Curated annotation (Swiss-Prot):
GO BP term, pick one: viral translational frameshifting
Organism this protein belongs to: Escherichia phage T7
Other observations noted: It is believed that a second protein is produced by a -1 frameshift during the translation of gene 5.5. This frameshift may occur anywhere within the region corresponding to residues 85-99 of the sequence shown. Thus a portion of these residues may be replaced by a portion of the segment GLFQTISCNSTGGVL in the actual gene 5.5-5.7 protein.
Lineage, top ranks: Viruses, Duplodnaviria, Heunggongvirae, Uroviricota, Caudoviricetes
Identification of the protein by name: Fusion protein 5.5/5.7
Coiled coil: none
Amino acid sequence: MAMTKKFKVSFDVTAKMSSDVQAILEKDMLHLCKQVGSGAIVPNGKQKEMIVQFLTHGMEGLMTFVVRTSFREAIKDMHEEYADKDSFKQSPATVREVFLMSDYLKVLQAIKSCPKTFQSNYVRNNASLVAEAASRGHISCLTTSGRNGGAWEITASGTRFLKRMGGCV
């Protein structure tokens, strides 16, 4: 009787980007942001995420996103071309809820201005958006001395993001 063994493969990738490529990519991203801001184009899903990564995490976040999506696309193509598909399977992609930027900014603004006594209900009613903001490092319930008594506060990164995006829309 044959035994079936499953292997899960994971690996790290180090991507190096020359300053010339970085300058070109940064110029292209600024051009894309201006076009989207002026309404000249409506970005597709990939372009939207590139803009978010660029504005939130800078070139490092953008490069991480580009490398990750490139590898995912290459692996999907490899899977389609692979002859023995029964022995090569992919797990489903992690799907996260998509939020409107205005809703996201409202949550950041509310956490920034909401009295600590009202935060519990607000956080409970907007749990998915609060979780998204926390995962991006824009809010935190931790301080340097430990837990903040269960109260959420906007981080310096969250404040910069709010200012960059023009506050609550």
